[in-house]
Amino acid sequence: MHYPEPISKLIDSFMKLPGIGPKTAQRLAFHVLDMKEDDVVQFAKALVDVKRELTYCSVCGHITEEDPCYICNDKQRDRSVICVVEDDKDVIAMEKMREYKGLYHVLHGAISPMDGIGPEDINIPSLIERLKDEEVKELILAMNPNLEGESTAMYISRLVKPIGIKVTRLAQGLSVGGDLEYADEVTLSRAIEGRTEM
């Protein structure tokens, strides 16, 4: 079907988002067309602001408005423990349970040879550098319980063990193949409490 060019561009833009196919993109584009102009302007501004006003923490890699982020700046945090996660949504999920008091390191992905993603393509080199500078006693590997997450956890574990840092993995209770961000607070809390050494 041929759409006016502005609608086609909007549909193409929506399709760049994960999980948005042609039909959903079309539905969203026509919904935007029906919105009040003020709401569309506010929506567009929010999209631009998220790119312009946020950055990644130079210490942990978490999204932030100021560098270092509020977590790395918090002097009450236990600096001897770092929880390594795949993405920012995982930090948010962990923080919701209000039990973990250590620091984080965000990888921004997982090792996935099938997708051409190796250890150098995610935030692993900065983690190793960070471990040299800080007095970390434990590294909690909180990758998603899927093939990529397990591969990433094993890779990091092998790199870190010779340094003499205790490496633990979240307890299973998280479903295999599931994502950390969708786990409820109770499940996450139990997984943290029952973590195992690697």
Curated annotation (Swiss-Prot):
Q: Which Gene3D superfamilies match?
A: 3.30.60.80, 3.40.1360.10, 6.10.250.240, RecR Domain 1
What CDD domains does UniProt report for this protein, alphabetically? Answer: TOPRIM_recR
Q: Which Pfam families does this chain map to?
A: RecR_C, RecR_HhH, RecR_ZnF, Toprim_4
| Keywords per UniProt | DNA damage, DNA recombination, DNA repair, Metal-binding, Zinc, Zinc-finger
Q: Which residues form the Toprim domain?
A: 80-175
Family from the record? Belongs to the RecR family.
Provide the protein name.
Recombination protein RecR
User: What is the organism field in this record?
Assistant: Staphylococcus carnosus (strain TM300)
Gene name, please?
recR
